Amino acid sequence: MVSSFSVPMPVKRIFDTFPLQTYAAQTDKDEAVALEIQRRSYTFTERGGGSSELTVEGTYKLGVYNVFLEANTGAALATDPWCLFVQLALCQKNGLVLPTHSQEQTPSHTCNHEMLVLSRLSNPDEALPILVEGYKKRIIRSTVAISEIMRSRILDDAEQLMYYTLLDTVLYDCWITQIIFCASDAQFMELYSCQKLSGSIVTPLDVENSLLQKLSAKSLKISLTKRNKFQFRHREIVKSMQGVYHNHHNSVNQEQVLNVLFENSKQVLLGLKDMLKSDGQPTYLHLKIASYILCITNVKEPIKLKTFVENECKELVQFAQDTLKNFVQ
């Protein structure tokens, strides 16, 4: 009687003829993922070429929507004003120099502070920037937490606090509406996503991809309106974006709101000229001003806000460039 645990003779003959071979362990490292991480990583360096020994627990990683290379300095800057403000503030606090290229070009094998291009979905509230400190004892600071910390540092100066608040409400709202409604989807995605929209539609697959990309852009726009309490200040705008049908009445109201925001922003920008004087290193208000100006002038399409800044606020543009030079080699 054959036991249920015995090996059938035909199978036994095969394994006797072709014995099992032990293979070496295979690495589980995904090279494609590693290269993508390097492509999205930008390393800060110490001012003056210093090289203090950093451990993994002593480093931070700043998550942003996307980056651009600034034309005059070659610095890799965040494309969003809030992200760029935190980037500049971290450089000033830690004595760092802005990155100029990704790790894809020059991989780093040492522990350094980094800026990473991330999806908004990397944060539960779908907003960036986020700041990750340490590795094993990891501390993750959300956009709201970062904003509260930065704001707390100027509470003692009423005038700076007033302008800081105006920038993060009036000018911020104008920036968001101009990028969402006045720029193309391709321009918007270039600023707030590492995905690029395809401009050519040839095959049915291209049509399908184009529709998916438009849905992705709309989803990202809606999530952006939830940052900095924008949705509470402009309920009608957000409501019209979430609706299936966008009627003429909503379009007229939206245009009126955009015009009011733009006019108010013009007054704020023109009033900043008296706040540009500095004794020594830039203040947090100066970094905030420079962040908005650099991001506005980076927009490739001629939105009204960019045109006004370049034509009527040349002093602010020069101030932003001078501020940026504090953080380049």
UniProtKB/Swiss-Prot annotation:
One of its GO terms (biological process) is protein insertion into mitochondrial outer membrane. It is found in: Mitochondrion outer membrane. InterPro entries: SAM35. GO terms for cellular component: mitochondrial outer membrane; mitochondrion; SAM complex. It holds the Pfam family SAM35. Keywords: Membrane, Mitochondrion, Mitochondrion outer membrane, Protein transport, Transport. Present with 1470 molecules/cell in log phase SD medium. Essential component of the mitochondrial outer membrane sorting assembly machinery (SAM or TOB) complex, which is required for the sorting of proteins with complicated topology, such as beta-barrel proteins, to the mitochondrial outer membrane after import by the TOM complex. Component of the mitochondrial outer membrane sorting assembly machinery (SAM or TOB) complex, which at least consists of SAM35, SAM37 and SAM50. This is Sorting assembly machinery 35 kDa subunit. It comes from Saccharomyces cerevisiae (strain ATCC 204508 / S288c).
